[in-house]
């Protein structure tokens, strides 16, 4: 449902497993046997699980602050209990309802102006169907805590330490995720945008260390 991405009506396309299949289609279309994947926020849980399910095709993976990927049982239960109502609100309210979501880009006022403006242009293209289906089938099922101790490939967490609600999840990640390297930044949730130069350096060094 983001930007020009497709937003099918069929709910089956929004599961983490379905995303993994799409990543494989992209990999094969690129003609590469092994690659690196990087996930931001909600996408982090999707790329992390892909790296677990398709480890033979992943050299390493990177992720940023993700409270959905590292959600505890209480948070997951809350999302599951509220998913239907939240999804229906988006379908009925459209773009106006999407703009009320706490993580909408319009609230990311600390971003550099040119990045903020680009995000807002993209946000105007949000698909209510895509966002509604994401709330139903993606967000409540993205947690990777069950597979984290068995993560088979090197993984880099680029953590924005200004995001207070991620602190507990970061500590959990450091304690439980196998093969984890972590680099911390003086940034918030959007670490790759707020600290782009440092983020690029960290990711480049991580990739170079594995190839």
Locate the predicted segments by residue.
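Catalytic histidine-centered segment of alpha/beta-hydrolase-like enzymes
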Residues: 187-200
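Flexible "cap/lid" loop of the alpha/beta hydrolase fold
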Residues: 48, 52-53, 58-92
């Amino acid at each position: 449902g983001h930007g020009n991405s497709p937003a099918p009506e069929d709910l089956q396309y929004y599961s983490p497993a379905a995303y993994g299949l799409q990543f494989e289609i992209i990999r094969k279309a690129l003609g590469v046997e092994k690659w690196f994947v990087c996930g931001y926020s909600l996408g982090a849980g999707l790329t992390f699980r892909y790296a677990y399910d398709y480890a033979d095709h992943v050299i390493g993976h990177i992720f940023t602050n993700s409270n959905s990927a590292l959600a505890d049982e209480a948070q997951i239960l809350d999302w599951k209990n509220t998913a239907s109502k939240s999804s229906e609100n988006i379908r009925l309210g459209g773009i106006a309802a999407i703009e009320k979501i706490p993580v909408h880009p319009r609230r990311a006022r600390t971003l550099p102006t040119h990045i903020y403006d680009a995000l807002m242009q993209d946000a105007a293209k949000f698909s209510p169907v895509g966002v509604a289906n994401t709330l139903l089938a993606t967000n409540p099922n993205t947690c990777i805590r069950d597979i984290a101790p068995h993560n088979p490939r090197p993984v880099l967490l680029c953590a924005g330490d200004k995001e207070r609600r991620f602190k507990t999840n970061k500590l959990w990640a450091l304690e439980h995720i196998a093969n984890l390297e972590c680099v911390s930044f003086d940034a918030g949730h959007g670490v790759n945008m707020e600290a782009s130069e440092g983020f690029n350096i960290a990711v480049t060094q991580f990739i170079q260390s594995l190839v």
